[in-house]
């Protein structure tokens, strides 16, 4: 194998093999953040996570919802990365843990405010001659 072929990055779903049996974070198109152990995947990057939690962040607070075994359709994945357990602990200890039931309404409120701001910004940009793209679920 020559050096040129070694430089080309491996970007297909096969590159996920290094993450199997490791703790990963998955960010979905709708903004959900899932943390769990990647157990399996297929050629379409459909994922199976075990011991999954859905983590909700609001300001300096976070809450976890246990989801157990979770199957994610590959087209909904925006980001997938391995978690460094030490760094995760250091990052989370700076936040206040709250019950997810209390945070969920706050998260919905923040999401609605964000959508409203995006709509207002889009209207303004359109009024000064810019083209505004994006659909109702185009969050990335």
Curated annotation (Swiss-Prot):
It holds the Pfam family LSM. It comes from the Eukaryota. GO terms for molecular function: mRNA 3'-UTR AU-rich region binding; mRNA binding; poly(U) RNA binding; RNA stem-loop binding. Residues 129-140 are annotated as: Confers RNA-binding specificity. The keyword Cytoplasm applies. GO terms for cellular component: cytoplasm; cytosol; Lsm1-7-Pat1 complex; nucleus; P-body; ribonucleoprotein complex. Keywords: Cytoplasm, mRNA processing, mRNA splicing, Nucleus, Ribonucleoprotein, RNA-binding. Its main location: nucleus. Component of the cytoplasmic LSM1-LSM7 complex which is involved in mRNA degradation by activating the decapping step. The LSM1-LSM7 complex loads onto the 3'-end of single stranded RNA. Component of the heptameric LSM1-LSM7 complex that forms a seven-membered ring structure with a donut shape. The LSm subunits are arranged in the order lsm1, lsm2, lsm3, lsm6, lsm5, lsm7 and lsm4. This is LSM1-LSM7 complex subunit lsm1. It comes from Schizosaccharomyces pombe (strain 972 / ATCC 24843) (Fission yeast). The gene is lsm1.
């Amino acid at each position: 194998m020559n050096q040129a072929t070694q430089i080309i990055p491996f970007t297909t779903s096969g590159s996920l093999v290094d993450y199997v049996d490791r703790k990963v974070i998955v960010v979905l198109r709708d903004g959900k953040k899932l943390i769990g152990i990647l157990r399996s995947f297929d050629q379409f990057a459909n994922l199976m996570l075990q011991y999954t939690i859905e983590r909700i962040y609001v300001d300096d607070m976070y809450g976890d919802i246990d989801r157990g075994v979770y199957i994610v359709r590959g087209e909904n994945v925006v980001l997938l990365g391995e978690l460094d357990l030490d760094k995760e602990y250091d990052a989370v200890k700076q936040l206040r843990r709250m019950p997810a039931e209390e945070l969920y309404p706050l998260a919905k409120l923040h999401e609605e405010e964000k959508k409203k701001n995006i709509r207002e910004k889009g209207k303004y940009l359109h009024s000064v001659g810019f083209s505004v793209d994006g659909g109702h679920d185009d969050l990335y």
